[in-house]
Structures are given as structure tokens and as C-alpha cells.
Amino acid sequence: ALAEVSMGDANEDVKAAAAGALGKLTARYTDAAGMGASELYLRLAQLYYAGSFRVLAYADRPLVLWYWQDGLKNQPVPRHLYVLKLAEEAAYDALRVSPDNSSARALLARIIASEKRATDALAATMGGDELFDSYANGLASAAGVVAAMGWPTLSQALGDSLDSGDQGAAAFLLDVMPHVYGGADFTTDHPVVRATMDPNAGVRLAAAEALLRFNAGSRLTSFPDPDGFMN
């Protein structure tokens, strides 16, 4: 936020103050030096999503999200979604500053996927709680929201999930991707093909099911041994 204000606020005094505060922060956290506002928001989202203590230690103790709407207000969040919602908020900020930030868009797809899976996993025990149910209802269309991000974004999100061992998000994305597949040719390094050889059996199974739904095995330039999916 300081980087954003230091570059874009109309008041020069505010810009100068923000730049000074940003300089002090980057002197302490040197890995943030030279990064633009969108990059910094993305990095914050990545740290939240990874559960990094570096950012969790500074998170608000109450399980609420703060926002500005004719004054400072807050919104309660279920405990199981709190860190994911912080990550989501930062990813949206990254896209607000720079709508072409493809890495932020891909991370957002993974965040929404993880929110949906986490909520579904707790539905049997938490269902009936008013706050939980309100968020569960809001996530009912999560697959459609993720699908609307398009094939390039989902491909990048799947690749990032495989690289980081984010198995739950990978399985969710593989379930959604057949809905937006446009018939593009696959290559051996495409994340869908890579998923068929992932160390996790659940991801391999999700990839196998996705390939069946693509109904386009002939387009694969290199098709792995199907007997290897569950080994």
C-alpha cells in the first residue's frame, strides 16, 4: 500500500511521507527493495497463502477483514478461511494496481480453489453455523469463478500448484480445466501432462480423469503410460 501511495497519490506531501516509510521498510526487508506496488501485493499474497509466520505474526488478532466504505469497517471471517481471505485480498490488490499481473491472477485461482476445498471439508461438522454457511454459500460458484479466468491462467495456476506441492488446488484446477479447454495442442511440459506424473496419487488420478474429459488424447504429443497413474 505504501508503494502504491508513494507513486500515485495526488498530494505530494502524502507521497513523500509514504516514500519515506517505504524506504524504512525496504531497508529492513531488503527482498522487497525495487519492487512495484503490484509485485509487493503479490508477494504479500504468496506469503499469506504459504502460511508464512513473517506475515501471520502481524495479522490482526481478531478474525476480521478490514475495509473502507464510508469509514473503516470490518467483516468477520470463519477461522478456517482467515489466512486465505487475507491472501485473496492481497491478490485482488495486486490485480487492481496491475490488471495484467498474470502471476497474481494464477494465485487467485489457487486461493479460491483452496477456499472451496477447505469449506467443503468442514461442511459436515460446521454446517448450521451462520457465519460458516454464509461463506459456504458464497463459494458455491467457486468452480465457475475459477473457470472464468480462462485456460492460460488455469494452466499457469496448475503449473504453480505442481511446483509448490499444492495438491488440493491442483486437483481442483484439473476438475475445472476441461470446462474451458479449447482444443489446444498439449506438449510434454504442459502442466496437465506433468500432473499425470506427479508424485501424489490424487493429483495423478485427477489428471487422468481430466484427460478422459478432454476427449483429446490424440492431441498429446507425448502420452504417459496410463498404468503409471496410480503407481
List the predicted regions and their residue ranges:
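Short coil/linker segments at helix-helix boundaries
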Residues: 31, 36-39, 43-93, 114-148, ...
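Buried hydrophobic core positions in alpha-solenoid tandem helical repeats
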Residues: 1-5, 154-159, 189-193, 226-231
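Short inter-helical turns and helix N-cap capping residues of alpha-solenoid HEAT/ARM repeat scaffolds
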Residues: 10-11, 165-166, 199-200
